[in-house]
């Protein structure tokens, strides 16, 4: 039976501001990435998200981003590799404290937004992220864009496990990178089209780029976004589609 991980970014509320549909999404995913206070989230939200994740028995990972609350971590920042290392180490250690306090074990790290996209094409940024993971806990996996040489080389250098990731509701360019969110066609808004793309990636190992070219994708995890208007409906639909196609949903071992 084919097995795939379904992951979602959660814990992105901040103070009085609620983001996402965390409680409703949790039953349909196998791993989550928890915001660590830089681009979103706060200590109370981090603790609550960890506790809920443990109740649902899903794998818990840190979701470090740039210190950019206003831009939600989706804006590129002109930072050094050392700064990236500091940002990531600080955030993943903070989340790990909450996970340990709840009696759990953190499983992975997935960079957020602009940090993720920059790392996918910038070896120095990817290296800084992998080094922070290695120094904090080398048993943690790194979730990174499938086929990204920067992520692959960084993970190999520090001997950490890379879990290659694809996206259910994002479009791809012919080089295998994601279409920028600044472009109108960055998101797949039609649920059926998104599910078709996911099944292509999981069962056939490719995705159609925005230009119609076939791009090879060997993904071990699929990201669902939990903050969309129909996020819960889509999560439920893809979960049932996988069941129908005998695709097992399970966090990476």
Swiss-Prot record:
<dbReference type="InterPro" id="IPR011330">
    <property type="entry name" value="Glyco_hydro/deAcase_b/a-brl"/>
</dbReference>
<dbReference type="GO" id="GO:0005524">
    <property type="term" value="F:ATP binding"/>
</dbReference>
<protein>
    <recommendedName>
        <fullName>5-oxoprolinase subunit A</fullName>
        <ecNumber>3.5.2.9</ecNumber>
    </recommendedName>
</protein>
<keyword id="KW-0378">Hydrolase</keyword>
<keyword id="KW-0067">ATP-binding</keyword>
<comment type="function">
    <text>Catalyzes the cleavage of 5-oxoproline to form L-glutamate coupled to the hydrolysis of ATP to ADP and inorganic phosphate.</text>
</comment>
<keyword id="KW-0547">Nucleotide-binding</keyword>
<dbReference type="Pfam" id="PF03746">
    <property type="entry name" value="LamB_YcsF"/>
</dbReference>
<dbReference type="GO" id="GO:0005975">
    <property type="term" value="P:carbohydrate metabolic process"/>
</dbReference>
<comment type="similarity">
    <text>Belongs to the LamB/PxpA family.</text>
</comment>
<dbReference type="GO" id="GO:0017168">
    <property type="term" value="F:5-oxoprolinase (ATP-hydrolyzing) activity"/>
</dbReference>
<comment type="subunit">
    <text>Forms a complex composed of PxpA, PxpB and PxpC.</text>
</comment>
<dbReference type="InterPro" id="IPR005501">
    <property type="entry name" value="LamB/YcsF/PxpA-like"/>
</dbReference>
């Amino acid at each position: 039976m084919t097995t795939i991980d379904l992951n979602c970014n959660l814990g992105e509320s901040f103070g009085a501001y609620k983001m996402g549909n965390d409680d409703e999404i949790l039953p349909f995913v196998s791993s989550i990435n928890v915001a660590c206070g830089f681009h979103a989230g706060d200590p109370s939200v981090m603790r609550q998200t960890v506790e809920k994740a443990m109740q649902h028995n899903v794998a818990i990972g840190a979701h470090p981003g740039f210190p950019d609350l206003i831009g939600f971590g989706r804006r590129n920042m002109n930072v050094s590799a050392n700064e990236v290392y500091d940002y990531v180490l600080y955030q993943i250690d903070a989340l790990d404290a909450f996970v340990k306090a709840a009696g759990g074990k953190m499983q992975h790290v997935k960079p957020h937004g602009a940090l993720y996209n920059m790392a996918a094409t910038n070896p120095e940024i990817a290296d800084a992220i992998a080094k922070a993971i290695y120094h904090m806990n080398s048993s943690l996996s790194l979730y990174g864009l499938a086929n990204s040489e920067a992520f692959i080389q960084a993970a190999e250098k520090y001997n950490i496990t890379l879990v290659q990731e694809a996206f259910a509701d994002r479009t791809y360019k012919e080089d295998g990178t994601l279409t920028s969110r600044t472009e109108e066609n960055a998101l797949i808004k039609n649920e059926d089209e998104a599910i078709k793309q996911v099944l292509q990636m999981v069962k056939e190992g490719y995705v159609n780029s925005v230009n119609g070219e076939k791009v090879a994708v060997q993904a071990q995890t699929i990201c669902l976004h939990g903050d969309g208007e129909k996020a819960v409906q889509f999560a439920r639909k893809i979960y049932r589609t996988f069941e129908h196609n005998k695709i097992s949903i399970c966090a990476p071992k």
